Amino acid sequence: MGTQKLDYIDAVRGWAILLVITCHVGTMFPEMPYPVRKLTNFGWHGVQLFFLASALTLLMSWHRARVHDGVFVGSFFVRRFLRIAPMYYAGAAIYFVAEPPISGFSLSQMLISFAFLNTWQPEWIPTTPGWMVVPGGWSIGVEFTFYALFPLLAVLVTSLPRALAFFAVAFAFACGANHLGATWLAGYPADAAANFLYFWFPNQVPVFALGFVLYFAIESRRVPTLGKWPAYIFLMCVAAALITVAEFPVMGGRILLSTPTPPILLASLGFMTFIFVLARQPALLLTNPLIRKMGVLSFSAYVLHFLFVHGLPVWSGGWINTAATGYVAIAHFVLLWGVAVPTTFAAATLAHAWIERPGMKLASRLISQATSKAIQRA
């Protein structure tokens, strides 16, 4: 696979983390004008952009390999665990010190989160009052559930028609699971139940399925490379559609089955198109070196950005006023965003070098040793 192809995937991750940071900075200013607040809230769907990129890159790696034996599958799990777990566990330690849980330490909550099982109960995410071991950790739990299923899915879903069938099955499964989940959660507060049904894995499965559709669409030789200006025009249309999804409440709730056109699905379709265009015309301003570097650092940035989004207003001595209202709130939002982004990526640069990269190197060593032993036994 060429470097240029990997460049656009890094860029996608860069845009995803900027969307997520924008959303969480926006939540700090509840009195911003409503249309602006709704637009920043759309950054919530940056997680779905991450999920699409994850499915796409895993499929690229899977199809590059010539053999998919037990050693390969074992190596896949080792690589995924050591890619994510070290920074995730470090984040848990950082937040335990920086934002101590009001409810106190809970060994069971920590172990459930460390096992990436935290998206299977409202108390574990939590959407009820409780200790969130790593802010935003729900998406990492969802990602690990996808990892657990990925080898089986990659074996079964081997073409564009099968990917489309997978999406149809995933959508039906999500709707059915959310219907049953709503009944199961009837005793919980409405907000806790609704948030859980958005976060949990069944509601996100169709997004990963769209990642499979995207992979086979990109690999199809029937679609020509786009020219630069047609690509820009197409992306402007995608941006306009995404802004429409963000601004108009007629689209309804966030949970599949809650409306005929849930925004999670509409946003994912828009992001899918965005990635497809970048794959066909990667030499765009949207894949510039800075955004690609942000993509490389995006996981550490995801784990750490809450620290700065929550902390900077406190540390600023009043310069960043989260109680501001109206247009003044917009100015303070811009100020917080403008400081939180570079400080987050400065910290992420260190975390990537000191925590993520050693984990990846350890994975490579373990995989190399396992492969050598398998060859010797053969």
Kindly label every feature range from the protein language model:
Residues M1-T183, R292, L297-S298, S316-A378:
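Membrane-cytosol interface segments of multi-pass membrane proteins
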Residues Q4-D7, P35-V47, T128-V142, A182-L210, ...:
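Interfacial loop-to-helix transition and helix-capping segments at the boundaries
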Residues V20, F199-W200, A301:
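A composition/secondary-structure signal for short, hydrophobic, low-basic-content segments
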Residues V25, R64, S220, L304-L307:
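N-terminal low-complexity, intrinsically disordered patches enriched in charged
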Residues P30, R222, G311:
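Conserved protein kinase catalytic core
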Residues T57, F114, V213, G270-V277:
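Specific aromatic-rich, kink-prone transmembrane helix
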Residues L149, L156-A172, A217, R221-A240:
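Hydrophobic alpha-helical segments of polytopic membrane proteins
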Residues Q204, F208, Y232-R357:
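Alpha-helical transmembrane segments of multi-pass integral membrane proteins
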